[in-house]
């Protein structure tokens, strides 16, 4: 498969950025989106050009670091998956693909496709602890939780903190992220004040 890539390039946070066009050829349909960017970067390095900076960590869909706007959609053409879980078979051979960083004041661009995610880190660091001794794990059957409540809690806990909600929200609000974090716990009976 062959693709034309329109990629946002920006030297640093203060520089004015813009789109640059690249071609990648002979890409397998089973290549992940990030692997395709790796191939592009290998080609650029071989040509003596600067590679495209992009963020990633686990490449398994659990960390949310690979956050990109692909053709105007957060994480690309699929629903409920991160960029690293997108495979090139989702795109038509010969397609032009536009790749941008998150567009939100909460995530200022550092370089190319890399954004500063510290705003979400601050939210996570602001809470998430209790002041009592927890001792050992309580008996799982001591406080029965209805399956519907447990299912809703698990759905909310599926949030990996990637920032897609804030990046696609016209207000750039991180409240969807905070709501997912809080909702995952709010549905579960705690049994004590805290």
Q: What are the language-model segments listed below?
A:
Residues 7, 70-72, 101:
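Flexible glycine-/small-residue-rich
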Residues 1-3, 64, 95:
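Residues at beta-strand starts and edge strands
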Residues 51-89, 154-175:
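Local cysteine-cluster metal-coordination motifs and their immediate loop/turn environment
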Residues 13-16, 74-78, 92-93:
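Short, solvent-exposed loop/turn segments that connect beta-strands within catalytic domains
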Residues 79-105:
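A surface-exposed, charged beta-strand/loop segment in the N-terminal or early-internal portion
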Residues 1-23:
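Eukaryote-biased recognition of intrinsically disordered, low-complexity regulatory segments
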Residues 31-50, 95-194:
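Ferredoxin-type iron-sulfur electron-transfer modules in oxidoreductases and energy-metabolism complexes
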């Amino acid at each position: 498969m062959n693709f034309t890539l329109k990629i946002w390039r920006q030297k640093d946070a203060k520089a004015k950025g813009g789109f640059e066009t690249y071609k990648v050829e002979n890409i397998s349909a089973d290549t992940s989106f990030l692997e395709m960017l790796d191939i592009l970067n290998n080609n650029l390095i071989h040509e003596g050009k600067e590679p495209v900076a992009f963020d990633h960590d686990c490449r398994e869909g659990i960390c949310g670091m690979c956050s990109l706007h692909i053709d105007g959609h957060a994480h690309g053409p699929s629903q409920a998956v991160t960029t690293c879980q997108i495979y090139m078979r989702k795109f038509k051979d010969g397609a032009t693909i536009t790749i941008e960083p998150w567009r939100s004041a909460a995530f200022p661009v550092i370089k190319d496709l890399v954004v500063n995610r510290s705003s979400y880190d601050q939210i996570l660091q602001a809470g998430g602890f209790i002041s009592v001794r927890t001792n050992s794990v309580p008996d799982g059957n001591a406080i029965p939780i209805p399956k519907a409540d447990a299912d809703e809690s698990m759905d909310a806990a599926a949030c990996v903190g990637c920032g897609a909600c804030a990046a696609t929200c016209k207000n750039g609000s991180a409240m969807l992220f905070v709501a997912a974090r809080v909702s995952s716990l709010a549905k579960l009976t705690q049994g004590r004040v805290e």
